[in-house]
């Protein structure tokens, strides 16, 4: 792990790096929201851009939003997409070039219709659409069961997007649930984004990929088990899984516990480069 210096370095010399802009829950102000950069060689991806992300980038990390070239959104809650309108307008009017976005056709349609068009559809030059602001990088579906997995590459970064259970209107039905995905990065890093406690999903991924490190959603207080994995639930996982698991998306209740005492790798921290060979 490396400490943040003066600005976020969006290049590496061969290593894969994850840099969390924030690690907090949707309502966290002190820890910001759980948004992060994936960085390798000359390529980077900003994973999610919540309401606080542009502020955190500029005020905490001295990094302007114009530095962002590639974006991936895991689901349409405000702590994950609330800053996207600012990114889009900056790309159109300041950078004058559209922003690359990794997104399926399904999510592209619903994201524009239900979340973005209210602030982005109308301009002084007439009506605009999704493709006026973004260049879609469409991932390829590589698996249907036990859950959908999509894959793409951004430069030297391989990304697999797997469907997750986050907000489910019908238990165990992804078709009747809000779109949400987690990520497998270079076949060795697992990032769940927001996800319910689903040990069967974890076990399947761990059996099929050589996962070195896990960054897992964690509701420390435990009041949102219907949509987030709770700390209590995660504590029931086998020791070999917990030992490589960092917890993120936590709230202020995290100040009262030390997860290493329960066998976890710890809480993920904002402003730290997590480096992997």
Outline where the language-model segments fall:
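Residues at the starts of beta-strands that form the adenosine-phosphate
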Residues: 17, 43, 98-100, 212, ...
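Core dinuclear metal-dependent hydrolase active-site scaffold
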Residues: 1-60, 138-200, 270-277
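Active-site metal-binding motif and surrounding structural segment of the metallo-beta-lactamase
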Residues: 51-103, 210-214
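Active-site flanking residues adjacent to catalytic metal/cofactor-binding acidic residues
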Residues: 47, 74, 191-193, 216, ...
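Residues in the short beta-alpha loop(s) of Rossmann-like NAD(P)-binding domains
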Residues: 50, 104-107, 219, 251
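Cap/insert and terminal regions of metallo-dependent hydrolase folds
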Residues: 195-277
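Acidic/polar short surface loop at catalytic or gating sites that assists cofactor/ion binding
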Residues: 98-143
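Structured loop/turn residues at beta-strand edges in well-structured enzyme cores
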Residues: 13, 63-66, 155-157, 209, ...
């Amino acid at each position: 792990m490396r400490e943040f210096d003066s600005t976020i370095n969006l290049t590496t010399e061969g290593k894969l790096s994850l840099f969390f802009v924030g690690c907090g829950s949707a309502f966290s102000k002190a820890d910001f929201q759980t948004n992060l950069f994936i960085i390798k060689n000359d390529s980077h991806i900003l994973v999610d851009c919540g309401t606080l992300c542009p502020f955190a980038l500029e005020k905490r990390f001295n990094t302007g939003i114009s530095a962002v070239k590639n974006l991936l959104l895991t689901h349409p809650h405000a702590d994950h997409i609330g800053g996207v309108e600012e990114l889009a307008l900056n790309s159109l009017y300041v950078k004058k070039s559209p922003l690359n976005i990794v997104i399926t056709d399904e999510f592209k349609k619903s994201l524009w219709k239900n979340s973005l068009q209210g602030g982005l559809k109308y301009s002084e030059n007439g009506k605009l659409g999704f493709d006026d602001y973004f260049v879609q990088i469409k991932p390829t579906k590589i698996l249907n069961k036990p859950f959908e997995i999509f894959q793409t590459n951004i430069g030297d970064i391989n990304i697999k997007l797997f469907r997750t259970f986050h907000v489910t209107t019908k238990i165990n039905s992804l078709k009747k649930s809000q779109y949400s995905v987690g990520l497998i990065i270079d076949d060795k890093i697992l990032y769940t984004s927001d996800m319910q406690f689903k040990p069967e999903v974890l076990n399947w991924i761990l059996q099929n990929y050589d996962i070195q490190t896990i960054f897992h959603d964690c509701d420390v207080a435990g009041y949102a088990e219907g949509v987030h994995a709770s700390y209590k639930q995660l504590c029931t996982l086998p020791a070999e899984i917990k030992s490589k698991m960092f917890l993120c998306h936590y709230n202020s209740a995290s100040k009262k516990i030390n997860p290493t005492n329960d066998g976890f790798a710890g809480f993920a921290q904002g402003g730290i480069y997590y480096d992997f060979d």
